[in-house]
Amino acid sequence: MIVAKTDKSLAQEVLKFVAPRANIQGVHSDFTHIGYYDGDKIVGGTIFSHYDGFNIWMHLALDNPRAMRRSYAKQVFEYCFYTCKCVRVTAMTKPNNIRCRKLIESAGFKQEGIVRKVIREGMKFHNAVLYGLLRNE
């Protein structure tokens, strides 16, 4: 059974899992997290970063998208909108990551545009699809 964990002692483990899968760069200290574990094995995670009082960036990575149960999605949005009092949540993914795009859109995010050459993989830069979810949506 997969359980969500927010223990501070797991923060770096969750970041190490999510960062390469979600193309996160530059998030090393000021972030919060939710880790999804099957026993002792991490199978997913959400990193929240760049909180400015109104907006927070959400970075999600899962070994299996079916692992994201509705109760976990609810926990993610409660954290963003009720704990942090955000007006919006922002997410990005590569245009060819269809599974991620479907998951983001099924959660209610709206596509807002394309950000050019923002995702770096090695020495290559890729475009990203920018998504936003407003509290009142």
Label each region the model flagged:
Residues 68-79, 98-106:
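Conserved acetyl-CoA-binding loop-helix of GNAT-fold acetyltransferases
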Residues 1-24:
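Short amphipathic alpha-helix that is part of the acyltransferase structural core
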Residues 110-125:
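Conserved catalytic-core motifs of GNAT/GCN5-like acyltransferases
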Residues 53-64, 92:
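Conserved acetyl-CoA binding element of GNAT-fold acetyltransferases
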Residues 30-44:
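Conserved beta-hairpin
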Residues 82-93:
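Conserved GNAT acetyl-CoA-binding A-motif
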Residues 91-101, 118:
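Conserved beta-strand-loop-alpha-helix junction that forms the acyl-donor binding cleft
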Residues 40-45, 56, 126:
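Glycine-rich phosphate/pyrophosphate-binding loop shared by adenosine-nucleotide-utilizing enzymes
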